[in-house]
Amino acid sequence: MSSFNELEKLLGYSFKNKELLIEALSHPSLRQHHEYKDNKDYERLEFLGDAVLNLVITKILFSNFASYNEGNLAKIRSYLVCKETICMVGAKLALKDYIIMTYGEEVAGGRDNPNNIENATEALIAAIYLDSNIETTHNIIGQLWAEFIKVQNLTDYDPKTALQEWAQASDHHLPIYCLIKREGAAHSSTFTVLVKVKDYEQIGIGYSIKEAEKNAARSLLHRLKND
């Protein structure tokens, strides 16, 4: 399993049961091949990892943001467990290089598919949890998500709501979002969205329309703050 050594170094964790690590990185496309049909893929681990990630992030926020109410904590958690953030964590670990998939999935762009990266990241969290304990998993998630948790400005967590509130407070019409471009394959598209409030315009790019809208709103808020 030497090919996973670098990944384990980035995680700061060495698996006792390497089969769990392999399962966490096995794409469902493998079941299409007879030689792999009895092998496990990451779908069940992804299900567990999603729950573990939500629990750990909730605990971290509850401990670190004592002055925030339930609504603000929910906004921050939503940002920390969204596809965009999970994919950024997966990118830090270079997970796309470790996912085990069929040749067909790979040539179709599977290594750059945000869904695959998100699913493998969540499955990896579950594998760590099953291989160790909740305390170890908590520490690893805390390290991997540290740069995102440090963001203190609620505007960065929920920029669309913040932009809407700014528009209402300034007696402007509500923000208008328009999809202006979609690029890439169907399963790995990037979207470009334009947001407009009065005479202000800004674009945002993301792996989904929702993500692109949030990025556009965040960029416009930063621009308004600096004007």
Swiss-Prot record:
It is an enzyme of class 3 (hydrolase). CDD domains: DSRM_RNAse_III_family, RIBOc. It is found in: Cytoplasm. Keywords: Cytoplasm, Endonuclease, Hydrolase, Magnesium, Metal-binding, mRNA processing, Nuclease, RNA-binding, rRNA processing, rRNA-binding, tRNA processing. GO terms for biological process: mRNA processing; regulation of gene expression; rRNA processing; tRNA processing. It holds the Pfam family dsrm. InterPro entries: dsRBD_dom, RNase_III, RNase_III_dom, RNase_III_sf. Residues 4-133 form the RNase III domain. SMART domains: DSRM, RIBOc. GO terms for cellular component: cytoplasm. Residues 158-226 form the DRBM domain. Its cofactor is Mg(2+). It comes from the Bacteria. Its EC number is 3.1.26.3. Digests double-stranded RNA. Involved in the processing of primary rRNA transcript to yield the immediate precursors to the large and small rRNAs (23S and 16S). Processes some mRNAs, and tRNAs when they are encoded in the rRNA operon. Processes pre-crRNA and tracrRNA of type II CRISPR loci if present in the organism. Homodimer. HAMAP family: RNase_III. Belongs to the ribonuclease III family. This is Ribonuclease 3. The lineage of its organism: Bacteria, Pseudomonadati, Pseudomonadota, Alphaproteobacteria, Rickettsiales.
